[in-house]
């Protein structure tokens, strides 16, 4: 809510880390809980056009953004990825990317929330590339390095990476990509 507020400015921020977790517009939600409200989408759009960098993570970053043309246009034209269905349940315990393979929380447990049905996403531009893939090969992350801005979107919550050292190593690599000019 603070991010969406007109009083909050992204000016001066080198990068935005947008954590969507399990956010999604679902029929059983007690209140609206989209990955992007129109206010957030507009603010991110302006921020990226000014040369910012965005790291987006969440289980439903694709599927929650196919309902309207504005949603689809934002993820495809600005973030440079497109929804490719749900990731197969038999291939999503492991993720490959950044020259490593790691496990994510997929089943309910006492330690951490789990991503039960994450999206699969693919590049929507020939200037974007698959940066992460689930164990079965479906796309789990798309990176884009444009002339004025950069994005890295992953279709699982970053915080669901099981191993702390791997999380730290992954974040270091992600930051290196997003803030390097």
Task: Map each language-model feature to its residues.
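Aromatic-Pro/Gly-enriched surface loop or interdomain linker
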Residues: 1-22, 59, 144, 149, ...
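Helical hinge/lid and interdomain linker segments adjacent to catalytic or ligand-binding clefts
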Residues: 1-72
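Short amphipathic alpha-helical segments and helix-helix/interface helices
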Residues: 37-45, 118, 171-175
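Residue-level detector of buried hydrophobic side-chain packing
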Residues: 44, 51-54, 144, 148, ...
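An acidic, glycine-rich "communication" segment
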Residues: 56-143, 147
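A short, polar/proline- and glycine-enriched secondary-structure boundary/capping micro-motif
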Residues: 66-69, 162-166
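Active-site-proximal beta-strand elements of phosphoester/diester hydrolases
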Residues: 130-131, 151-157
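Short, solvent-exposed loop/turn elements at domain surfaces
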Residues: 139-141, 160-165
């Amino acid at each position: 809510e603070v991010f969406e507020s007109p009083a909050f400015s992204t000016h001066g921020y080198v990068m935005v880390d947008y954590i969507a977790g399990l956010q999604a517009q679902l029929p059983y939600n007690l209140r609206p809980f989209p990955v992007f409200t129109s206010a957030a989408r507009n603010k991110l759009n302006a921020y990226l056009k000014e040369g910012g960098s965005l790291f987006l993570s969440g289980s439903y970053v694709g599927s929650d953004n196919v309902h309207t043309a504005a949603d689809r246009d934002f993820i495809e034209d600005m973030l440079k990825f497109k929804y490719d269905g749900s990731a197969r349940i038999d291939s999503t315990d492991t993720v490959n990317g950044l020259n490593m393979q790691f496990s994510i929380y997929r089943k309910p447990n006492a330690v951490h929330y789990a991503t039960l049905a994450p999206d699969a996403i693919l590049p929507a531009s020939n200037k974007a590339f698959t940066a992460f893939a689930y164990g079965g090969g479906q796309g789990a992350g798309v990176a884009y390095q444009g002339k004025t801005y950069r994005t890295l979107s992953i279709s699982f919550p970053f915080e669901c990476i099981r191993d702390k050292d791997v999380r730290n190593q992954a974040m270091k690599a992600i930051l290196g990509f997003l803030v390097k000019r």
